[in-house]
Amino acid sequence: MEQGRPRSSLSLTSSASTVSSLSSLSAKKPTRVVHKVHAFGKRNNALRRDPNLPVHIRGWLHKQDSSGLRLWKRRWFVLSGHCLFYYKDSREESVLGSVLLPSYSVRPDGPGAPRGRRFTFTAEHPGMRTYVLAADTLEDLRGWLRALGKASRAEGEDCGLPRSPARPRPGEGPGGPGGPPEVNRREEGRTSESPEVAPLSRGPGRHEMHAPGSSADLQPDTWSRRTRSPEPFSPLSRPPSPLSLPRPRSAPVRRPPLSAGDISFPARPHTPLSRIDVRPPLDWGPQRQTLSRPPIPRRGPFSEAGGGRPPRSPQLRTPEHRTQSTQVSSGSSTYLQLPPRPPGTQASMILLPGPPVDSTLHQSLETDTLLTKLCGQDRLLRQLQEDLDKRQEEKEQLEAALELTRQQLGQATREAAASGKAWGRQRLLQDRLVNVRAALCHLTQERERVWDTYSGLEQDLGTLRETLEYLLHLGSPQDRASAQQQLWMVEDTLAGLGGPQKQPPHTEPKSPSPAPQREESSERESLSESLELSSPQSPEVDWGQPPGGDRALSSSQSGVGSPRVSRASSPECRQQSSPLLRTKAPLARPRMSAQEQLERMRRNQACGLSLPRPTSPRLLTLGRTLSPVPRQPDMEQRPIVGAAKWLRSSGSWSSPRHSTTYSPVSGGHRERVLSLSQALATEASQWHRLMTASPERNLDTRGDCLQPSPQPPSEELPQVTSSPTSHKANSATTGFSCQGSGRGLAPWEPRWDPGKAPPALAQEEGAWPLRVTLLQSSF
């Protein structure tokens, strides 16, 4: 049992050659004790650097020589993983030496240290060589101390639980391709140990003779398995949880569950208590044992925790081993780990949540940051606008000076000297004009960029104000108070800014002009015009409103109106309406109702006919009363030619009481329109026959006389007058006389002689094509 066990093993916490170990073949040779500090890790004994490990810091440092006059030598140092390598120069070709930093104490030198250089620090280990290094600046010193301190405490993401690795490949060290060199050379039998280890490593202790003896009967192959595998390098302290450790690159993904013999951790009583033996992992550093972190809390027996590891045999863990695994050396400054806490205290300490995040403070800081950025962008916009104004004024002055110079050149062609001066002045002005225009272009692009940032900040501020208003109404009392303060701060800042900035004119989204609408099809124009004039709103209310936003607002509130008089047509609302709404506005037009189609048919029929002037003064008065007031200029109304500008509705003007939105009907809508148009044509032909017939047929006992419709005055045609032929018909011998008040049906008597026929209408006058009886019923 004792022959299969090596006398000494490789201790990674100090270095690969601090305590050299013999292979199983050289175990019979006596170990020679060297009573001096061994200079380790230089040249051939240096560790091989793994190129896959990350480099934490690299740079130039001055290293004090360990022999002779203690001269300072400038070397290139690289901290990779937990090992410090140094080279001759920054090409990093050949390693001059290596220092494995775990269990080293790295501290800066005091001001009174007789080093001869500034910014020095020391890395020392008991029984090992002490390294004295010096940085060039104070910042370099702080950076190196921070990095080397973490590496000496074995902190970082590349340290973890050493797992049972696969067998090392031939030609590789026990730690894999990047591990320490294999130390089974026979010519290295004269390797030495440190003074502390040598007196204790001459033979096994008493506890070592008896402690594993009880388990030797139960597990006879334990020591042979330990000899073949690198298990003697496993740590003596409690290992952390395997779930928190990264998987090595060369290790298999899945491993079989370990037996009790594989998990046993042998004790080494000949090792000082201040050192822990760790086996070299596969990647020589990524999974190194974390020495400064507290161990995983115990949750009771393994059967309760449900872990994947089987319970250890009680014979494998003696009280001596427990004391060795929990004791901490007072001489080493690296191992400042406290003894394990009780399970309840440790679990409660780990499960304690962090301090709650103050959402109110975070939101206040966000508001303050947003307002600060907004003020900065506002200042930039104002400065850019001032610069643009100055450059624009300078450009105008240069253009005026160039015009004057051009005139002088035209006048002074005879004088050579004056002409030369004028040409030089013109050249200078042209150069300055080019520079000013280039500056204008640059300032314009800069203003566009700042404006984009300003617009984004305005949107963020609007969202933040909505959130604050929501908290002000529905939040907790504390949130309400904070939201109110932030809202006041926002209002004060915006008031100090003097309102929002105006968008640059050349980047303003242009609203659709009415010119393309005029060039559309005649059907679309007729629809818009009929919607304008046959709107459900009464003309008195519509024409009595002031121009601008109030009219547009009332039109949008009514729900129905023409797209030309919508809210988006006013200049104020054109800037506020989004491009999406402006593109969809022309598409959302309602279908024409039956009444609107009749209006359109009548208007088209009356366009080419000049209507005669009614002879009754009563009808003239009513026509003037019903004539529409000229519309406001902001309505973008298309000019109407001829008699088509005056449209008579069927019966009366629409009233707000009957303002119902038209919903398109299905089924016989088209047939209904055709039947109505046919009835109108029949009535028109009957009216034509009545006007051209004899007086006997014209005088009917029904008294159901038809009243001609008035022709109101308009802008282009102040009063539609009849032709000379109709003027003769309106004389004293011919015409109409009305009796009654105009309410209801009243007999209309002719004023011509009974023996004579009524005057026939001229061809250019035409007949009355409209249903004028409905106009009488509306009075």
Curated annotation (Swiss-Prot):
One of its GO terms (biological process) is positive regulation of Wnt signaling pathway, planar cell polarity pathway. Residues 567-580, 720-740 have a biased composition (Polar residues). Residues 246-259, 324-334, 528-540, 608-627, 649-659 have a biased composition (Low complexity). InterPro entries: PH-like_dom_sf, PH_domain, PKHA4-7_PH. Residues 183-193, 517-527 have a biased composition (Basic and acidic residues). The modification Phosphoserine is found at S164, S562. Pfam families: PH. Residues 54-153 form the PH domain. Signal peptide: none annotated. It is found in: Cytoplasm; Membrane. GO terms for molecular function: phosphatidylinositol-3,4-bisphosphate binding; phosphatidylinositol-3,5-bisphosphate binding; phosphatidylinositol-3-phosphate binding; phosphatidylinositol-4,5-bisphosphate binding. Keywords: Cytoplasm, Lipid-binding, Membrane, Phosphoprotein. This is Pleckstrin homology domain-containing family A member 4. It comes from Rattus norvegicus.
